[in-house]
Amino acid sequence: MLQPKNTKFRKMHKGKNRGLAIGTNVHFGLYGLKAITRGRLKSSQIESARRAITRAIKRQGKIWIRIFPDKPITKKPLEVRMGKGKGNVEYWVALVQPGKILYEISGVSEELSRIAFKLAAAKLPVKTMFVTKLVM
């Protein structure tokens, strides 16, 4: 699972997930998976999508993960009364805005990468689309 090695503070405010994304172009690979809705991706969801891509391309080519879960989400234990402070960190999420490139692939055919990204998109809670690198 992805999570930061160390952070300045253990817990974080809930905050908002507004605005447009940074990192909207395919930069490293030839094909990318772009988010078209906003949401929060858990580290487990990012990892399961990565596994789906790896299995689909049969360990050929190269994969880049362009998102990292850096926001801790806390949860209080079951049947605990309100108050007594904020709960413990339960999992880590990455905030995703529309237009953000989530994964990139190179070294495989476009047809195979479309299949791989379709399998990965089924594991993610945001709507996605397949994009190719713009060659100038």
From Swiss-Prot:
One GO molecular function term?
structural constituent of ribosome
**Per the record, GO CC terms?**
cytosolic large ribosomal subunit
Which Pfam families does the entry mention? Ribosomal_L16
Disulfide links within the chain: none
Keywords annotated in UniProt: Ribonucleoprotein, Ribosomal protein, RNA-binding, rRNA-binding, tRNA-binding
Q: Which domain of life is it from?
A: Bacteria
Q: Which GO biological process entries does UniProt record here?
A: translation
What function does this protein fulfil? Binds 23S rRNA and is also seen to make contacts with the A and possibly P site tRNAs.
NCBIfam families documented for this protein: rplP_bact
Output the HAMAP family linked to this UniProt entry.
Ribosomal_uL16
Q: How does it assemble?
A: Part of the 50S ribosomal subunit.
Family as reported in the entry's similarity comment = Belongs to the universal ribosomal protein uL16 family.
From the Swiss-Prot or TrEMBL record, give the protein name: Large ribosomal subunit protein uL16
Species of origin: Buchnera aphidicola subsp. Baizongia pistaciae (strain Bp)
Q: Which gene is the coding source of this polypeptide chain?
A: rplP
